[in-house]
């Protein structure tokens, strides 16, 4: 049985770049043992009649040594800074790349004082930069958390669904506050036999500190 990752784009799922930030996103998660054909399934909806679907594309590329990438805030296009470009980036269509890694999100906000004024990596840039650099869900988590560690986090509290054809994770992240670079984050793997969801509320209530 061939196992695939299916990413369902509900109406408005991909219009984040051209409109004010949607704080009404919903993610549905189905583990591979909870689906009839053994596929990991995730869906992503913006839950708004004002957002209309757009399909983004980044072609796979090789980049010269020393190349830099401009980061712009995903919702407003405000320039945030530059980061070194990876030597190789993968093909991305929508919210999935050529290796069947997919990333979606929902915003839960959190305490305003935990925002970071000088961070470079906002939630949207984290998604699409990481998709271009990751071959698995676990590599995407490492990429996202390394990026905010090195360049700061420029968004409020977020829940990310991060999946590949074998497993799916929820990564939650919020800034450390004024003058503190990076983010506080936790990632938990969704069991293969589980169905889960998140919609603008933090989902991880207990942190298993002994499970790494």
Indicate where each model-derived feature is located.
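A contiguous strand-loop segment
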Residues: 25-123, 143-212
